[in-house]
Amino acid sequence: MVLALLLPTAAMAEEAKEGAPKVAYITLSPPFVGNYALDGGPRLRVYKADVALRVTGDEAAKAVQHHEPLIRNQLVALFTQQTVDSMSNVEAKEHLRQEALKQVQQVMEAEEGKPIVEDLLFNNLIVQ
């Protein structure tokens, strides 16, 4: 009897899932590679960042892919401005991730009228 009562609930939950927009992760490829801490010091510092953006819905994914050159430009500028301190520990990297998300959302707001990107993930971040 309990099973019979749960079946309609499970069916309704499945229908809701089918109608809901799907989350997508868009990998910005190729990875970002460049120099940072360009303060005139004797040592050349290099970063490599594999970045993915989380969006919900096909339209959001298409918009991000359409504006990928602008997004990449903004992120390259941000990464290049970093100092040794801002790339050297976990807390600093988390702050960089949040700032990168904010800047990507600003690009999308300017181009599409809404932030669209829900999260930015570093799949890999290497600094030397």
Can you say where each PLM-predicted feature lies in the sequence?
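Flexible, low-complexity charged segments
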Residues: 1-128
